[in-house]
A protein has these predicted regions:
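Acidic, Gly/Ser/Thr-rich repeat motifs that build Ca2+-stabilized beta-propeller blades
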Residues: 17, 22-188, 247-259, 264, ...
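Beta-strand initiation motifs
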Residues: 32-40, 80-86, 138-152, 213-233, ...
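Surface-exposed loop and turn segments in beta-propeller and other repeat-based domains
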Residues: 86-100, 149-166, 211-238, 282-312
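Beta-propeller blade signature
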Residues: 133-141, 193-209, 273-275
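Short, conserved, GDST-rich strand-edge loop motifs in beta-rich repeat architectures
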Residues: 180-200, 267-270
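Acidic, glycine-rich loop-and-beta core segments that form the ion-binding/anion-interacting portion
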Residues: 235-276
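Conserved blade-ending motifs and adjacent loop-strand segments that build the rim/top face
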Residues: 242, 354-376
């Protein structure tokens, strides 16, 4: 997901012990659009190093957890005045960051975290380069600290290139763990992973981590679309034909799975409603346009996005959430998302019956929306890659 900001960019690598920090400096030449919302610092006393995910623990403690790409997770109390955060997990020595799209990318708490203390992470490791889904457990002595010795590797998927790793992991309303994997990288999906259901790449997976099969750390739900009756197909696949679904989320009211898929060189950035067994087109199509071949492609059996935009609005979509909080009632039921490169945030209204309606909320060239998150009350937060966590407020007249 974390494409380099354009049009003028400089990359500086700072080596500090085992850590490598990639700082992307840029200058954009873009017309500033009028915004109906503004940013405000959610936790003005806290800063982070390249935050890429924000989650809350489902244990009633009203804590938030911010994932730093370098390999650390910080825990802190969800209060604007908070000044203290705790290192919940530090796996920088295991995380590989050879490219700006690698690192520690995702965090998911088990639905019964309060009882079992389990949480899961998605990161890139090296030798061989691979995506790792691992489980850890909360320390029995300190709820603000994880027990590193509890690590259990659930799944590993080899990555042929450094980019398009996906990174989001989410427990669905059914209790299964959903995992986003990009097409394996390079450009244009040279190995056609998006349309190859024998590989896990280019897909969203669905696995059961509570009832592992013999010899595995998970099982495949019997109602997965390729479970048990498709020779050669990877049974873990829930949906496929995706390029790099960096961020996805479930609407807690409707149960819909919303995914934002980062585009190629056209580029077309797209939003999909992910459904079981559906093929979302990549690399036959990019969004609603033919990609391979560029003209006259066969669209039969492909599911097109509910919304897309092109390079005049941004070049790297960051998926968000359907807003179900109470602070901003005018956003209720709308999908809030953004673009990492242009600094735009939008709301998308879609009921499944009528065409989606999109509206600009904010255009801030100083915002780097790498991810979104929600707290226990479904209030929305925005992770900016420059180290700050924001929330929205209505713009002053």
């Amino acid at each position: 997901m974390l494409k380099k900001r354009k049009y003028i960019w400089t990359v500086v690598i700072l080596m500090a012990g085992l850590s490598a920090f990639l700082l992307i400096l840029y200058e954009k030449k873009d017309r500033l659009e009028q915004s109906s919302y503004e940013l405000e610092g959610a936790f003005p006393n806290l800063t982070f190093v390249q935050p890429v995910d924000l989650q809350h623990s489902p244990d009633g403690t009203d804590r938030l957890f911010v994932v730093e790409q370098q390999g650390m997770i910080h825990a802190f109390l969800n209060a604007p005045e908070t000044k203290e955060m705790h290192v919940f997990l530090d796996i920088r020595d295991e995380v590989f960051m050879g490219d700006s799209e690698e690192g520690l990318l995702g965090l998911a708490f088990h639905p019964r975290y309060k009882e079992n203390g389990y949480f899961y992470v998605d990161y890139v490791a090296n030798n061989p380069r691979r995506t790792v889904i691992a489980r850890f457990q909360r320390s029995p002595d300190d709820s603000d600290k994880a027990d590193r010795s509890s690590k259990l590797v659930i799944l590993e998927v080899e990555q042929p290139y450094s980019n398009h790793n996906g990174g989001q992991i989410v427990f669905g309303p059914d209790g299964c763990l959903y995992i986003a994997l990009g097409d394996g990288g390079s450009g244009g999906d040279p190995h056609n992973h998006g349309q190859d259901v024998s590989t896990l790449l280019g897909s969203i997976l669905r696995i059961d981590v509570d009832h592992p099969s013999p010899g595995k750390k998970y099982s495949v739900p019997p109602d997965n679309p390729f479970s048990g009756h498709h020779v050669g197909a990877a049974e873990e696949i829930y949906a496929y034909g995706l390029r790099n679904p960096w961020r996805f989320s479930f609407d807690p009211v409707t149960g819909r799975l919303w995914a934002a898929d980062v585009g190629q060189d056209k580029p077309i950035e797209e939003i999909d409603i992910i459904e079981e067994g559906k093929n979302y087109g990549w690399n036959i199509m990019e969004g609603s346009s033919c990609f391979k071949p560029p003209l006259g492609c066969n669209k039969k059996g492909l599911t097109l996005p509910i919304w897309e935009y092109t390079r005049d609005k941004g070049r790297c979509i960051t998926g968000g959430f359907v807003y179900r909080g109470s602070r901003l009632p005018e956003l209720a039921g709308s999908y809030i998302y953004g673009d990492f490169i242009s600094g735009r945030l939008w709301k998308l209204t879609y009921d499944g019956r009528h065409p989606a309606v999109n509206e600009l909320l904010l255009h801030n060239p100083d915002l780097y929306p790498s991810s979104f998150g929600v707290d226990e009350n479904q209030e929305l937060y925005i992770c900016s890659f420059d180290g700050r966590i924001y929330r929205l407020k209505e713009a002053k007249d």
